[in-house]
Regions:
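Structured, basic alpha/beta domains of bacterial-type, RNA-associated proteins
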Residues: 1-13, 20, 29-117
Length: 117
């Protein structure tokens, strides 16, 4: 079974927000997942769409290298997950001389695409 993955690291948004988008496409066919991401109003869907297109291209490239033919209709999202990246900490002035900590979160996105049997 041919499969390939694509990863985009250090994306500057909360992992929790990206997980909302990724849960929509996990297990779907690649074409259906792309359509879902394209029409999703979430800003995180743009990054997820780029990674999914890259994973699709990686499968096609692997198939070409192995002299195999792959029907794009048989591709599906076999795994998609979001890991937390580094958190940048900033200080915001607060009342009475105090300071509040602002956490600017980041995450790593991985999408794996496989060929259905």
């Amino acid at each position: 079974m041919l499969n390939a993955r694509a990863t985009k690291r250090y994306l500057r948004s909360s992992p929790r927000k990206m997980r909302l988008v990724i849960d929509l496409i996990r297990g779907k066919s690649a074409a259906q997942a792309l359509a879902t991401l394209k029409f999703s109003p979430k800003s995180a869907s743009k990054d997820a769409e780029m990674v999914l297109r890259s994973a699709k291209a990686n499968v096609m490239e692997k198939a070409t290298a192995a002299n195999e033919r792959v029907d794009e209709g048989k591709l599906f999202v076999s795994a998609a997950y979001v890991n937390q990246g580094p958190t940048a900490k900033r200080i915001s002035p607060a009342p009475m001389g105090r300071a509040y900590r602002i956490r600017k979160r980041s995450h790593h996105l991985t999408i794996e695409v496989s060929v259905a049997q």
